[in-house]
Amino acid sequence: MKITEDIIYAGVNDHQVDLFEGQYRVPNGMAYNSYVILDEKTAVMDTVDANFADEWLANVAKALNGRKPDYLIVQHMEPDHSANIENFVKAYPEATVVANTKTFAMMKNFFPKMDLAGRKLEVKDGESLTLGKHVLTFVFAPMVHWPEVMVTYDSTDKVLFAADGFGKFGALDRDCLLYTSDAA
């Protein structure tokens, strides 16, 4: 699904889950959101739940349309956002993982055998990454959910990738309203 001309949704729907985080009923399932930004350089925003590795990697490959990703941006280490970091790194060994200091520290605990030597870009609050025409600015949002959370703002398309800052329960292909607004 295209979000903008250069941003493509690569997430997955989970219709098997009945409780999110073991406590919230989700009768309409869950959506695990991930996006691909296509520019001179490409970026993948977050991964998805571990049970959907193959589907997600296929969605990413389809969105990339034959290109290789330059970056994986990890905004949040909760497993529904990060469980496939290691699978991504294995599938795309040339890609650089972008995250903040706290995220990289947590990543070592989640994936103790994963080697990111020479493949990581540690960002600070307010720093930007230029993909071409898209400029991504990283804004730390600790305790939006977990202490390492950051959000990413694309100033070109004026899109905020909000990690767990906003959202709803429910798969995108069931009982879901898509909200759009005209900024003009």
Each PLM stretch: what is its role?
Residues K2-L64, V151-D154, K158-A162:
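Conserved beta-strand hairpin/beta-sheet module of binuclear metal-dependent hydrolase folds
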Residues N87, N109-P112, L172-D175:
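Short acidic, glycine/serine/threonine-rich loops at helix termini
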Residues M77-S82, A105-M106, H145-W146, G167-G170:
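Active-site environment of divalent metal-dependent phosphoester hydrolases
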Residues L160-L177:
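Short, solvent-exposed beta-strand-terminating loops
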Residues F20-R25, V48-A50, V74-H76, L136-P142:
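Short, flexible loop segments at the rims of nucleotide/cofactor-binding pockets, characterized by
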Residues E40, N51-V98:
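Active-site metal-binding motif and surrounding structural segment of the metallo-beta-lactamase
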Residues Y179-A184:
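Conserved small/polar residues in nucleotide/adenosyl-binding loops
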Residues K2-E5, A99-V149:
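Metallo-beta-lactamase
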